[in-house]
Amino acid sequence: KSAVKAPLSPGGARGVGGEWGHKSTERREKMESELDRIDLKILTCLQADGRISNLKLAEAVTLSPTAVLARVQRLTKDGYILGYEARLNPLKLGAGMMVFVEVLLDRTTPNVFEAFKAAVQVRGEIMECHMVAGGFDYLLKTRMADMAAYRDFAGTVLWQLPGVRETRTYPVMEEVKNTTQLALR
Protein backbone atom coordinates (compact mmCIF):
# COMPACT_ATOMS: atom_id res chain seq x y z
CA LYS A 1 0.00 0.00 0.00
CA SER A 2 1.38 3.37 -0.98
CA ALA A 3 1.68 5.84 1.87
CA VAL A 4 1.28 8.90 -0.39
CA LYS A 5 -1.26 9.50 -3.11
CA ALA A 6 -1.29 12.39 -5.54
CA PRO A 7 -4.09 14.89 -4.89
CA LEU A 8 -7.17 14.62 -7.08
CA SER A 9 -7.42 18.36 -7.52
CA PRO A 10 -6.24 21.63 -6.04
CA GLY A 11 -7.71 21.64 -2.58
CA GLY A 12 -7.01 17.93 -2.30
CA ALA A 13 -9.01 14.77 -2.01
CA ARG A 14 -11.62 14.14 0.66
CA GLY A 15 -12.01 17.81 1.46
CA VAL A 16 -8.37 18.50 2.33
CA GLY A 17 -7.59 22.20 2.14
CA GLY A 18 -4.52 23.82 0.68
CA GLU A 19 -3.05 24.94 -2.59
CA TRP A 20 -0.73 23.02 -4.86
CA GLY A 21 1.84 24.45 -7.22
CA HIS A 22 2.38 28.08 -8.08
CA LYS A 23 0.35 29.71 -5.29
CA SER A 24 2.45 28.11 -2.55
CA THR A 25 5.60 29.24 -4.39
CA GLU A 26 4.18 32.77 -4.59
CA ARG A 27 3.43 32.77 -0.85
CA ARG A 28 6.97 31.58 -0.06
CA GLU A 29 8.50 34.24 -2.33
CA LYS A 30 6.32 36.95 -0.74
CA MET A 31 7.38 35.84 2.76
CA GLU A 32 11.03 35.85 1.75
CA SER A 33 10.75 39.33 0.20
CA GLU A 34 9.26 40.69 3.46
CA LEU A 35 12.06 39.22 5.59
CA ASP A 36 15.61 40.37 5.16
CA ARG A 37 18.82 38.55 6.11
CA ILE A 38 18.79 40.00 9.62
CA ASP A 39 15.16 38.98 10.23
CA LEU A 40 16.01 35.42 9.21
CA LYS A 41 19.07 35.42 11.49
CA ILE A 42 16.93 36.66 14.39
CA LEU A 43 14.39 33.90 13.76
CA THR A 44 17.15 31.30 13.53
CA CYS A 45 18.67 32.45 16.83
CA LEU A 46 15.30 32.49 18.59
CA GLN A 47 14.50 28.98 17.33
CA ALA A 48 17.74 27.71 18.82
CA ASP A 49 17.29 29.57 22.13
CA GLY A 50 13.97 31.25 22.85
CA ARG A 51 15.38 32.57 26.14
CA ILE A 52 18.33 34.40 24.58
CA SER A 53 18.67 37.90 26.03
CA ASN A 54 17.98 40.84 23.77
CA LEU A 55 21.59 41.95 24.30
CA LYS A 56 23.04 38.61 23.16
CA LEU A 57 20.61 38.49 20.23
CA ALA A 58 21.72 41.98 19.22
CA GLU A 59 25.37 40.88 19.34
CA ALA A 60 24.59 37.78 17.24
CA VAL A 61 22.94 39.80 14.47
CA THR A 62 25.21 42.88 14.83
CA LEU A 63 22.47 45.41 15.53
CA SER A 64 21.70 47.59 18.52
CA PRO A 65 19.47 46.09 21.22
CA THR A 66 16.81 48.71 20.47
CA ALA A 67 16.75 47.81 16.76
CA VAL A 68 16.61 44.09 17.55
CA LEU A 69 13.75 44.56 20.01
CA ALA A 70 11.81 46.51 17.38
CA ARG A 71 12.37 43.75 14.84
CA VAL A 72 11.32 41.00 17.27
CA GLN A 73 8.17 42.96 18.11
CA ARG A 74 7.41 43.41 14.38
CA LEU A 75 8.06 39.72 13.65
CA THR A 76 5.69 38.82 16.48
CA LYS A 77 3.02 41.31 15.39
CA ASP A 78 3.25 40.06 11.79
CA GLY A 79 2.76 36.45 12.92
CA TYR A 80 6.22 35.05 12.20
CA ILE A 81 6.80 34.40 15.91
CA LEU A 82 3.83 32.58 17.44
CA GLY A 83 5.13 32.30 20.99
CA TYR A 84 7.76 30.79 23.26
CA GLU A 85 7.62 27.58 25.25
CA ALA A 86 9.85 25.25 27.23
CA ARG A 87 10.77 21.85 25.80
CA LEU A 88 10.07 19.28 28.50
CA ASN A 89 11.58 15.83 28.98
CA PRO A 90 8.71 13.37 28.40
CA LEU A 91 10.61 10.49 30.05
CA LYS A 92 10.87 12.38 33.34
CA LEU A 93 7.19 13.35 33.19
CA GLY A 94 5.62 9.93 32.61
CA ALA A 95 5.03 10.34 28.88
CA GLY A 96 7.99 8.41 27.48
CA MET A 97 6.10 6.41 24.88
CA MET A 98 5.22 8.09 21.58
CA VAL A 99 2.63 6.47 19.33
CA PHE A 100 1.49 7.60 15.89
CA VAL A 101 -2.05 6.65 14.94
CA GLU A 102 -3.71 6.64 11.53
CA VAL A 103 -7.43 7.34 11.83
CA LEU A 104 -10.01 6.52 9.17
CA LEU A 105 -13.43 8.08 9.67
CA ASP A 106 -16.68 6.34 8.76
CA ARG A 107 -17.91 9.38 6.82
CA THR A 108 -16.10 12.40 5.43
CA THR A 109 -18.67 15.12 5.92
CA PRO A 110 -18.10 18.57 7.38
CA ASN A 111 -20.08 17.64 10.52
CA VAL A 112 -17.96 14.53 11.17
CA PHE A 113 -14.72 16.45 10.57
CA GLU A 114 -15.77 19.23 12.96
CA ALA A 115 -16.91 16.81 15.68
CA PHE A 116 -13.65 14.85 15.40
CA LYS A 117 -11.50 18.00 15.51
CA ALA A 118 -13.37 19.37 18.54
CA ALA A 119 -12.99 16.08 20.44
CA VAL A 120 -9.26 15.86 19.68
CA GLN A 121 -8.61 19.42 20.94
CA VAL A 122 -9.47 18.54 24.55
CA ARG A 123 -7.29 15.41 24.83
CA GLY A 124 -3.86 16.13 26.32
CA GLU A 125 -2.47 12.75 25.20
CA ILE A 126 -2.96 13.83 21.58
CA MET A 127 -0.08 16.21 20.92
CA GLU A 128 -0.66 16.70 17.20
CA CYS A 129 -3.50 15.99 14.80
CA HIS A 130 -3.09 16.39 11.05
CA MET A 131 -5.70 15.92 8.32
CA VAL A 132 -3.92 14.13 5.49
CA ALA A 133 -4.57 13.00 1.93
CA GLY A 134 -4.21 9.32 1.23
CA GLY A 135 -5.57 6.07 2.62
CA PHE A 136 -6.73 7.54 5.94
CA ASP A 137 -8.10 10.86 7.18
CA TYR A 138 -5.99 11.93 10.18
CA LEU A 139 -2.55 11.25 11.61
CA LEU A 140 -2.24 11.66 15.38
CA LYS A 141 0.91 11.99 17.47
CA THR A 142 0.24 10.79 21.00
CA ARG A 143 2.34 10.42 24.15
CA MET A 144 1.77 8.40 27.28
CA ALA A 145 3.64 6.37 29.90
CA ASP A 146 3.72 2.92 28.29
CA MET A 147 1.84 0.36 26.18
CA ALA A 148 -0.63 -0.38 28.99
CA ALA A 149 -1.52 3.32 29.12
CA TYR A 150 -1.89 3.38 25.32
CA ARG A 151 -4.13 0.31 25.40
CA ASP A 152 -6.36 2.07 27.95
CA PHE A 153 -6.31 5.29 25.88
CA ALA A 154 -7.24 3.39 22.71
CA GLY A 155 -10.26 1.75 24.32
CA THR A 156 -11.57 4.61 26.40
CA VAL A 157 -10.68 7.61 24.23
CA LEU A 158 -9.44 6.89 20.71
CA TRP A 159 -12.12 4.48 19.56
CA GLN A 160 -14.78 6.67 21.18
CA LEU A 161 -13.86 9.77 19.16
CA PRO A 162 -16.66 10.89 16.80
CA GLY A 163 -16.74 9.09 13.45
CA VAL A 164 -13.78 6.74 14.00
CA ARG A 165 -14.15 3.62 11.88
CA GLU A 166 -10.60 2.26 11.89
CA THR A 167 -7.20 3.01 13.42
CA ARG A 168 -3.67 1.82 12.81
CA THR A 169 -1.11 2.19 15.58
CA TYR A 170 2.63 2.76 15.20
CA PRO A 171 4.56 2.74 18.50
CA VAL A 172 7.85 4.63 18.18
CA MET A 173 10.89 2.49 18.94
CA GLU A 174 13.44 5.32 18.71
CA GLU A 175 13.18 9.06 18.16
CA VAL A 176 15.89 9.70 15.60
CA LYS A 177 15.14 13.40 15.13
CA ASN A 178 12.75 15.61 17.05
CA THR A 179 12.87 19.34 16.42
CA THR A 180 10.53 22.28 16.12
CA GLN A 181 13.10 24.37 14.21
CA LEU A 182 12.24 25.35 10.64
CA ALA A 183 14.96 25.41 7.99
CA LEU A 184 15.34 29.10 7.19
CA ARG A 185 17.40 30.42 4.32
Q: Model-found features: residue ranges?
A:
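A compositional/biophysical signature of low hydrophobicity enriched in polar/charged and small residues
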Residues: 1-185
